[in-house]
Amino acid sequence: FGNAGCHLPHGMSYAVAGLCKDYHPDGWSSDHALVPHGISVIVNSPAVFRFTADACQERHLQAAWAMGAETRGAGIQDGGHLLADRLIYLMKETGIPNGLEGVGYGSEHLEDLTERAYAQKRLIDNAPCPVSRDQMKDLFESSLSYW
């Protein structure tokens, strides 16, 4: 994971998948609740990329462009928001749940999600900027709903 640059969205995904109580994704034959890995990563990603944007502005802008965002005329400082907005657009277009609320979480789960995710130090420490426990909780709160 370190070589791939995985960081906050992956670290946060362990909590999202691990604390799931009642989400049953369409198309999955399962007798128990689960949040598939890709969904558990993407539901946090827009909030994370807004948070990490200042740490590596050029990379965020390049990623937004690579995902099809309109970047003409954008400043380098716009990369994180363009990337987040593009991800949200793609989530809507492909039927991905609307943030954490879309997979069964609410504000009452923020503490548990934060505790579980903040323990994933190898991924949290790989982020392009430091993140405190309070900032992690804010990221989960920002991930509750996007539209």
PLM regions and their residue ranges:
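Active-site segments that bind and position negatively charged phosphate/pyrophosphate groups
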Residues: 1-86
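C-terminal charged capping/lid subdomain of soluble metabolic enzymes
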Residues: 60, 64-147
